[in-house]
């Protein structure tokens, strides 16, 4: 039995944003670990979606609600009495943030305020993790990876709202949770961290403006894969890498509050591919199973500003918790193709999802 399994068995964990792509993977992992899972979110953001495909509503305490509704959120915290809270609810898309900046700030900033307020008012909570993004940093197009103490100042409304979410967390931590000590005036201890992950990939992502879902949609419609920014470099990683890292941070800081802090979660340098390389790898793996279906076509669309080069330095989380990437990009893409071939064949996706979770957890 892994450390995560020993720790999470029977633990009450509340996830905000549990109906999203990453949230649904988080639910599946926690169920595999034996946790008691509750979630608070709007309806799933896409149709189809992983949450419904895995029939998660039947397996967890799922509560529908807007993260901006503080009174409703307080009710759910009081009802569920969680020990651990993972805050993932967000408006997560850069391009959408240009269309809906006010909504993006409202969800990503005030949503964080509301969750932290509920953590403050709920005595059962001992560990809180705020999931932000690699895009919280002011982007200088550096070759080196960004470190946790670099300037927080995202460019676009999405990235900047997540920078603000980091600052909100820091303020609450210092104002109400005793700063680094984690000791509140009441004597209660709460460990608080933020985690900044790179771009996640995996089966069950059906979002717009994401490269792998675009690839799947293209091949299933017998169309070429249109690549709008082939030379933009991102810290791509399988969704299970950050999900299990979040759970490790939540576990370890509860055991030892001095480990609470801010952490980057990104892949090794050799796995920081540009979008063109990522699509080429997808085509190679897909065509190995379904020959000649995947074809790439570059077509810049003159869309709004997005960073060209973005890497994370994950030294801190590796040295603090021993966390390092388990799957290289070859292994990641093989599992994405495996999952989507199963899905497009009309199979129940629970077995392939659970198989991949077990493979990941059991790998040293």
Tell where the protein language model's regions lie, with residue ranges.
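N-terminal Rossmann-like NAD(P)+-binding domain of SDR-like oxidoreductases, especially those catalyzing
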Residues: 1-197, 360
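Residue-level recognition of oxygen-bearing side chains
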Residues: 13, 72, 103, 110, ...
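C-terminal substrate-binding subdomain of Rossmann-fold SDR/epimerase-dehydratase oxidoreductases
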Residues: 32-35, 199, 219-364
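Histidine kinase transmitter module recognition
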Residues: 65, 203-204, 324
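Glycine-/small-residue-rich active-site loops that bind phosphorylated ligands and cofactors
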Residues: 68, 93, 104, 202, ...
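A generic short alpha-helical patch detector that favors 3-5-residue windows
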Residues: 85, 207, 305-309
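NAD(P)-dependent short-chain dehydrogenase/reductase
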Residues: 140-145, 149, 157-158, 163-254, ...
């Amino acid at each position: 039995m892994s450390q995560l399994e020993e720790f999470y068995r029977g633990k009450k964990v509340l996830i905000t944003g549990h109906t999203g792509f990453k949230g649904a993977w988080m639910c599946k992992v926690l169920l595999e670990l034996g946790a008691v899972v509750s979630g608070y979110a709007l309806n799933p953001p896409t149709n189809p979606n992983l949450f419904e495909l895995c029939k998660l509503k039947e397996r967890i305490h799922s509560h529908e609600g807007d993260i901006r509704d503080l009174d409703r959120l307080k009710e759910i915290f009081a009802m569920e009495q969680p020990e651990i809270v993972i805050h993932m609810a967000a408006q997560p898309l850069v391009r959408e943030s240009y269309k809906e900046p006010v909504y993006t700030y409202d969800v990503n900033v005030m949503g964080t305020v509301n969750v932290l307020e509920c953590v403050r008012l709920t005595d059962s909570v001992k560990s809180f993790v705020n999931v932000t993004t690699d895009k919280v940093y002011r982007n200088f197009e550096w070759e080196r990876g960004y470190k946790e103490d670099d300037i927080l100042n995202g460019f676009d409304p999405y990235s900047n709202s997540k920078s603000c979410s980091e600052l909100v967390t820091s303020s609450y931590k210092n104002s109400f949770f005793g700063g680094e000590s984690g000791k509140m005036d009441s004597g209660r201890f709460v460990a608080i961290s933020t985690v900044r992950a790179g771009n996640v990939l995996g089966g069950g992502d059906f979002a717009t403006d994401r490269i792998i879902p675009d690839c799947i949609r293209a091949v299933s419609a017998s169309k070429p894969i249109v690549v709008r920014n082939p030379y933009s470099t991102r810290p791509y990683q399988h969704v299970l890498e950050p999900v299990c890292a979040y759970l490790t941070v939540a576990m370890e800081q509860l055991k030892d509050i001095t480990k609470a802090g801010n952490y980057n979660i990104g892949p090794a340098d050799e796995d920081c591919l540009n979008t063109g390389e990522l699509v080429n790898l997808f085509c190679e793996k897909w065509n190995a199973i379904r020959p000649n279906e995947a074809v790439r076509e570059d077509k810049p669309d003159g869309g709004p500003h997005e960073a060209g080069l973005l890497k994370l330095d994950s030294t801190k989380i590796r040295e603090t918790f021993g966390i390092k990437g388990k799957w290289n990009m070859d292994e990641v893409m093989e599992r994405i193709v495996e999952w989507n071939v199963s899905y497009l064949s009309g199979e129940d996706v629970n077995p392939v999802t659970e198989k991949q979770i077990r493979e990941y957890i059991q790998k040293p």
